[in-house]
């Protein structure tokens, strides 16, 4: 970590939980995690089949439209100005470049095009430019998703009016672990942005990252926060930490792969109608672990060889895996 002082340095504030949060207590979710592996996977697969085609997987493509230079100090992120990772700050992509990427994604079979920008919170003039990009993506018949940082209520409304279908804003981890991961944004601010997204009428995409040194109880706490949003997110990306040299979490102990599969299963059981997405970390997963994740209820992936600044399985590998497993595109 560099000597640069964090921007907007604040301490994590108390989390205001929706009254419906008692629907899933942390203890109840811990009990799911503790089930024998076969019993947990069987239960998750039962829930999955009640709501989805068990052999269909939705494909999204993620493009970094503005990379690096983020003032946040997230301990996992190579785009933070506080970490020396070699990621250079870029300007916002132009319409022609985004159009070309979206066309390639559609041709490869993606149905949703996600655009990510390394901002703490976009300025209104940034939103105006993103609106142009969204309209271009929508003109190609793709669903549009954005992840731009914190939003004001008017900004969320502007994105909705432009045609954004999903807005991603992750909780990252449980409230109890949050202060170890980031100090430049409080948990309540994340929840407030999610409320603005929901009020504007966009679908909520919200998940977190596992493998950051958290305990199982803290993983259960993250799932509880997600499941107790009212309603729960329509899309839930579950990321496994990708360790990047120069970030504070580089060199962390690896998460047991079966614990990752358990997290997928618990997310499926507690959020039965959500698309549970295998997100960052897939490149290092073996095919057998990915297959177990699909069995546990994962039904969405990021498709393409790059996720923002980190690697992802190439299209050919995914196509081969889908064929071996008999999976189709949702």
UniProtKB/Swiss-Prot annotation:
Amino acids binding [4Fe-4S] cluster: 70, 74, 77
Binding residue positions for [2Fe-2S] cluster: 114, 145, 205, 277
Substrates-to-products reaction catalysed: (4R,5S)-dethiobiotin + (sulfur carrier)-SH + 2 reduced [2Fe-2S]-[ferredoxin] + 2 S-adenosyl-L-methionine = (sulfur carrier)-H + biotin + 2 5'-deoxyadenosine + 2 L-methionine + 2 oxidized [2Fe-2S]-[ferredoxin]
CDD domains, A to Z: Radical_SAM
PROSITE patterns named among the record's database cross-references: RADICAL_SAM
Disulphides: none
Record flagged with keyword Iron-sulfur: yes
Cofactor(s) needed: [4Fe-4S] cluster; [2Fe-2S] cluster
Enzyme class: transferase
All residue ranges annotated as the Radical SAM core domain in the record: 55-282
GO MF term set: 2 iron, 2 sulfur cluster binding; 4 iron, 4 sulfur cluster binding; biotin synthase activity; iron ion binding
Tree of life domain: Bacteria
GO biological process: biotin biosynthetic process
Function: Catalyzes the conversion of dethiobiotin (DTB) to biotin by the insertion of a sulfur atom into dethiobiotin via a radical-based mechanism.
Entry similarity comment: Belongs to the radical SAM superfamily. Biotin synthase family.
Stated name of the protein: Biotin synthase
UniProt lineage: Bacteria, Pseudomonadati, Pseudomonadota, Betaproteobacteria, Burkholderiales
Gene name for this UniProt entry: bioB
């Amino acid at each position: 970590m560099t000597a640069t002082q964090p921007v907007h340095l604040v301490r994590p504030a108390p989390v205001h939980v929706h009254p419906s949060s008692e629907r899933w207590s942390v203890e109840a979710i811990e009990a799911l995690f503790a089930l024998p592996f076969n019993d947990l996977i069987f239960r998750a697969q039962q829930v999955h089949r009640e709501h989805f085609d068990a052999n269909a997987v939705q494909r999204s493509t993620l493009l970094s439209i503005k990379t690096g230079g983020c003032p946040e100090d997230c301990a996992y992120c190579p785009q933070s100005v506080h970490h020396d990772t070699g990621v250079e700050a870029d300007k916002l992509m132009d319409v022609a470049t985004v159009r070309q990427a979206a066309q390639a994604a559609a041709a490869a079979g993606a149905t949703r095009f996600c655009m990510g920008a390394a901002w703490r919170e976009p300025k209104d003039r940034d939103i105006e430019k993103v609106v142009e990009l969204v309209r271009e993506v929508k003109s190609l018949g793709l669903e549009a998703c954005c992840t731009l940082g914190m939003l004001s209520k008017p900004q969320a409304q502007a994105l909705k009016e432009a045609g954004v279908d999903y807005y991603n804003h992750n909780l990252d981890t449980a409230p109890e672990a949050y202060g170890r991961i980031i100090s430049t944004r409080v948990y309540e601010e994340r929840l407030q942005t999610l409320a603005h997204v929901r009020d504007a009428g966009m679908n909520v995409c919200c998940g977190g990252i596992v493998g950051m040194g958290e305990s199982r109880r803290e993983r259960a706490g993250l799932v509880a926060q997600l499941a107790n949003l009212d309603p729960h997110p329509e899309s839930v990306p579950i990321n496994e930490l990708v360790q990047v040299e120069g970030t504070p979490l580089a060199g962390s102990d690896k998460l047991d792969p079966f614990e990752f599969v358990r997290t997928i299963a618990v997310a499926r059981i507690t959020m039965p109608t959500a698309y549970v997405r295998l997100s960052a970390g897939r490149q290092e997963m073996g095919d057998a672990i990915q297959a177990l994740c699909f069995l546990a209820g994962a039904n969405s992936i990021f498709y393409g060889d790059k996720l923002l600044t980190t690697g992802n399985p190439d299209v050919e590998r995914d196509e081969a895996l889908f064929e071996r497993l008999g999976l189709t595109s949702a």
